[in-house]
Amino acid sequence: MLTTRLVDRFLDDSYSVETRRHVLPLTTARLTANACFRFAPPFLASISDDFGISLSRLGLALMITELAMGASPLLGSFVDRMHRRTAMTGGLLGISAAAVVAASSPNVWIFIVGILMISVAKFFFDIGLSAWVNDHVDYERRGRVIGITETSWALGLLVGVTVMGLVASQTSWRWGYAVGAGAVGLMALVIGARLDPHDVAGSVRDRNVVAAPMPRRGYLVFAAMFFLMASSQAMFVTFGSWLDDEFGYTEAGIAAVAFGLGAFELLASVTSARRTDAWGKERSAIAGAMLIIPAGVLLAVLHTQQVPGLVLLGLFLLGFEFAIVSLLPLAANLIPDAPGRGLGIVLAGGMLGRASMSVVATSTYDRFGIEIPALVGASMALGMILCLVIFSRDSRS
């Protein structure tokens, strides 16, 4: 079968049968979830116009949703006590319902409730998936499996957002969300039917283990995730408006750009899946961030040039994708006996980074254009590198 050949290219027989059997369906499910999660930023201009508000005001509303996700460490501990299948299928069903709320929202505040619900439900799915990988794969080889599942982030943009954007260009952004809701709901049924209902359950774990504290040096990874996600958010919430304002792109044109950017991200995901375990998690994450810095600076300089600007935007997001895929297995192993809690704490840092940058990037874009968000994104990547350098030194000492 085609799926078997695809798995064989990345995972040999040394990986468990359970891992090889389920990794592609889980990746597909996460693709649909990521498509719903990533749909709004490229089309913020259309959404803000529909609600009759400015881009910066919509950015402030998005900040509220990210700040509300500061409770993610608590959610991580909760997910650690759940069956993995329950966490993942419940998260997918929640995303589907939340996308319906966003699609039918009569005003911006109901829309924000829908976006917040997507974020919370996706967190349940992501933590459940990461914990499932931790249960089935040794840490030394975990980077490859996480790299495969993380291709869903790129494919969510390459395939999911592109399809939803094309639907939006012919109808409205609301129907884009409706399509996403249907796809996620379908994958919830698939995952619920495929996974073993008696798979590893966090509920049988010692509560003291689940509540294990984060090691002090783990907060350097928390800070690194803050800077990395802030860096990416600087571009994600502004590039659609930049294409519209600078070059007159329509929703269909933005969807086409999303397809191209997804290809860049997919290249980074596949490369990371193949190389991160060999190169080392910290070193690989730093390498990705080092690509962001020159791409952001040059984009600020060449933002009026369409082709160079698009290439630099692609390189910026390629660097981000390579870095995030490499950072996630490191984060999930900070508390080995409670991976959901450790990853939840680190992801809270990322959510705070996105929250702060949702306001900074949209407000500076409204005043100055894409130049300032691009430079801020580059500086955030530098902060991420410094955090991981210190973390790496502490690990060796």
Name the predicted role of every residue range:
Residues 282-327:
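C-terminal transmembrane helical hairpin of 12-TM major facilitator-type secondary transporters
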Residues 149-193:
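Helix-loop-helix hairpin linking two adjacent transmembrane segments in secondary transporters
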Residues 41, 219-259:
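Extracytoplasmic gate region of multi-pass secondary transporters
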Residues 337-367:
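A late C-terminal transmembrane helix in Major Facilitator Superfamily
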Residues 116-151:
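Cytoplasmic helix-loop-helix junction between adjacent transmembrane helices
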Residues 63-76, 259-268:
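Central cavity-lining transmembrane alpha-helices of secondary-active solute carriers
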Residues 71-106:
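Conserved MFS/SLC helix-loop-helix module at the cytosolic interface between two early adjacent transmembrane helices
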Residues 72-83, 268-280, 365:
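Helix-to-loop junctions at the C-terminal end of transmembrane segments
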